[in-house]
Amino acid sequence: MLGSRRLRSPALVLLLLRPLLASGDSASRLQTRAMNPGGGERGSPEDSHRLQRSTVPGSDPQRSNELLLLTSREGDSPEQRHHVLYFPGDVQNYHEIMTRHPENYQWENWSLENIATILARRFPNSYIWVIKCSRMHLHKFSCYDNFVKSNMFGAPEHTPDFGAFKHLYMLLVNAFNLTQNGMLFKNRSVWNKDCKASNCESNPSTSNGGQKENERTCEHVDEPSMSFPPLSLDGASFTLIGFSKGCVVLNQLLFELKEAKKDKNIDAFIKSIRTMYWLDGGHSGGSNTWVTYPEVLEEFAQTGITVHTHVTPYQVHDPMRSWIGKEHKKFVQILRDLGMQVTSQIHFAKETPSIENHFRVHEVF
């Protein structure tokens, strides 16, 4: 349980993200929001954040994603090799964008930045990567078009040859190469709790949804130089996490396993995946929320990856989407029958299903 941890708040380095400067009361709320699982405040005032936006290409120049990297500045060492890859769900976006949305502001506690902080506490001494969807329909529906064939609202159509594994592998290769070349620190914009709105200017940029958003860029802020060891895939290990809509990426990876293993580099990457977490998976399609095809799961069982599923009544007890709970049970049962190491837990079972508890699964998994 994350709520029982008493970890020192890390000094955070956030890279590959558009500069986000909240002003006035909004900035104050962001600075004082501490990620204290189980309730209370979120965002610790002693945390200093550096935020950058960058687009990292994947398997080809037309397939790229924005990445958010978070690592502890104090206590890091070149020996750290574990990486947590997180795929967000619907409505999750950068904090400033969420606070300005007429509906999504309600869930600003679960912005990409805040989730990265939760994961840093959940997985200490690990690099945390948030992989943003390439398209956000109506600024609400996350669409992982680079990983799986999707409809307008991001519901997937799974195939064995879309290239999700290749895209994910190349995203990491290219991002790691940027750290080796020192590119992540060149011409960086810095978001700092002491940076004032007067030091920033708004520039138009095109959002993933094809609509214009304001990109705020801070002027130079004096910061101590960063000591950041170059990242390497050699000897690295990985944990993959999908939340809600983000689980479609994990599902697509399962469909591609058999073919992906034929590539020696991707096969080596697959062998470096230690654990996969499905957090309350769901999407707007009428089926295939969970993978239930025995032949696909048989291939998955051969990997030896540890599986964790954490669900809430919001998804698995929804009477209007009864297939979700049935598919979840079947997914878990088939994997157990195949001898995989699987844990499955339902949270907030005695509480009324709610979107808030759906998001709170981040605090209790």
Swiss-Prot record:
InterPro entries: C2orf69_mit. Keywords: Electron transport, Mitochondrion, Respiratory chain, Transit peptide, Transport. Its main location: mitochondrion. It is found in: Mitochondrion matrix. Residues 1-24 form a transit peptide. Residues 28-64 are annotated as: Disordered. Transmembrane segments: none annotated. GO terms for cellular component: mitochondrial matrix. One of its GO terms (biological process) is oxidative phosphorylation. Pfam families: C2orf69 (PF10561). Residues 53-64 have a biased composition (Polar residues). Belongs to the C2orf69 family. May play a role in the respiratory chain. This is Mitochondrial protein C2orf69 homolog. It comes from Mus musculus.
